[in-house]
Amino acid sequence: MHILIPAAGMGKRMGASHNKLRLQLLGKPLLAWTLAAVAAAEAIEWIGVIGQPEDFPIWEALLEDLNLRQPVHLITGGETRQASVFHGLQALPKTAEQVLIHDGARCLATPDLINRCAQALGTYAGLIAAVPVKDTIKIVNREGVVVQTPERDSLWAAQTPQGFRVEPLRIAHEMAVAKGWEVTDDAALFERLGYAVHIVLGEETNLKITTPSDLPLAERILQHRREQEQDTLG
């Protein structure tokens, strides 16, 4: 399985002046945790990290330290996440038939989740990791007035990995460029072409590191996992 990792986020909401994936989490850059989880997933055979050239020397040094078993390719991204994924699709090997796309900032995803998404691509043309929404969601108009309360049973919070067959996803991105479509995830493009996108149960801990308050929470989750591993070994 091939996987693309968008890793060009500037982290404005983190208050950082540089790529937020360079921020430290228990002594390692955020991206190191993401890459370690991806590399530990048995299904993954090829990794593409999509970023900006100014970060590449840092990522190259990181990759040397990690010494992952899979080949890792650094791919120059675009001005938006959507454009970056489009660039990543162009960089896939010609033999790639399926691809997972996983946000670099989701550094808490487990190898199990990544493997389950890869396995599900054997059945589905498109899928996303997602979890049921716990809160009641309100649809609000521009005046700040609630206009609808959707049934919570039908609402899921999208995560990554998201997985697709390569050719229809590439076509969807080409159409997006031609028609000026702008979406927040790749599944939305897939849906616009009429393809079904299936749900793979995600993980409550699969947070996207977005604001400063996410960092201490991520540290607690990772520390808890370390303690569990030590208890298992000990």
From Swiss-Prot:
Pathway: Isoprenoid biosynthesis; isopentenyl diphosphate biosynthesis via DXP pathway; isopentenyl diphosphate from 1-deoxy-D-xylulose 5-phosphate: step 2/6. GO terms for molecular function: 2-C-methyl-D-erythritol 4-phosphate cytidylyltransferase activity. The record marks R152, K208 as: Positions MEP for the nucleophilic attack. It catalyses: 2-C-methyl-D-erythritol 4-phosphate + CTP + H(+) = 4-CDP-2-C-methyl-D-erythritol + diphosphate. PROSITE patterns: ISPD. One of its GO terms (biological process) is isopentenyl diphosphate biosynthetic process, methylerythritol 4-phosphate pathway. Keywords: Isoprene biosynthesis, Nucleotidyltransferase, Transferase. CDD domains: CDP-ME_synthetase. It holds the Pfam family IspD. InterPro entries: IspD, IspD/TarI, IspD/TarI_cytidylyltransf_bact, ISPD_synthase_CS, Nucleotide-diphossugar_trans. It comes from the Bacteria. Its EC number is 2.7.7.60. Signal peptide: none annotated. The record marks R13, K20 as: Transition state stabilizer. Catalyzes the formation of 4-diphosphocytidyl-2-C-methyl-D-erythritol from CTP and 2-C-methyl-D-erythritol 4-phosphate (MEP). Belongs to the IspD/TarI cytidylyltransferase family. IspD subfamily. This is 2-C-methyl-D-erythritol 4-phosphate cytidylyltransferase. It comes from Thermosynechococcus vestitus (strain NIES-2133 / IAM M-273 / BP-1). The lineage of its organism: Bacteria, Bacillati, Cyanobacteriota, Cyanophyceae, Acaryochloridales. The gene is ispD.
